[in-house]
């Protein structure tokens, strides 16, 4: 957006809700998610495991990654196919979560080795790419160029 002084700026819309009992399906939460078109789901489980930020990577999403103009911008700014890489990474994490649940139910020997591979691959993505130390000078924020190198 163009500011009155001639500089460019942006507007960020943030909608927050804290539903009683954590019910994310109640009407106010659903309306807020629909208006914001993105969702950061905080996870008590991740916080308990000291995995910060405690944003659940499976439940969280951004509908903006579906907009052609955003895809085009990211293709130009980072690299062609960036949204596909992000989608693939989220898929790895989702499959790892599913595999972890099966391993917990059936035990280590009750699942094929591929489940363990999926789980440990998702753990690697979680530890290396998703988790951050906000107090660390380097790890406090991740520039796009570093994100690109990490996903390559």
Regions found by a protein language model. Give the residues of each.
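P-loop NTPase catalytic core
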Residues: 1-152
């Amino acid at each position: 957006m163009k500011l009155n002084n001639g500089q460019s700026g942006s507007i960020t819309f943030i909608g927050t809700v804290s539903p009683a009992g954590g019910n994310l399906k109640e009407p106010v939460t659903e309306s807020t998610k629909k208006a914001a078109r993105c969702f950061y789901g905080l996870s008590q489980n991740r916080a308990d495991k000291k995995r910060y930020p405690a944003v659940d990577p499976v439940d969280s999403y951004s509908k903006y990654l579906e907009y052609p103009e955003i895809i085009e911008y990211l293709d130009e700014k980072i690299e062609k196919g960036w949204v596909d890489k992000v989608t693939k990474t989220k898929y790895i994490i989702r499959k790892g979560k599913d595999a972890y649940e099966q391993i917990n139910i059936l035990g280590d020997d009750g699942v094929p080795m591929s489940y363990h591979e999926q789980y440990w691959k998702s753990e690697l993505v979680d530890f290396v790419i998703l988790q951050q130390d906000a107090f660390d000078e380097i790890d406090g924020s991740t520039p796009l160029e570093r994100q690109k190198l990490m996903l390559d």
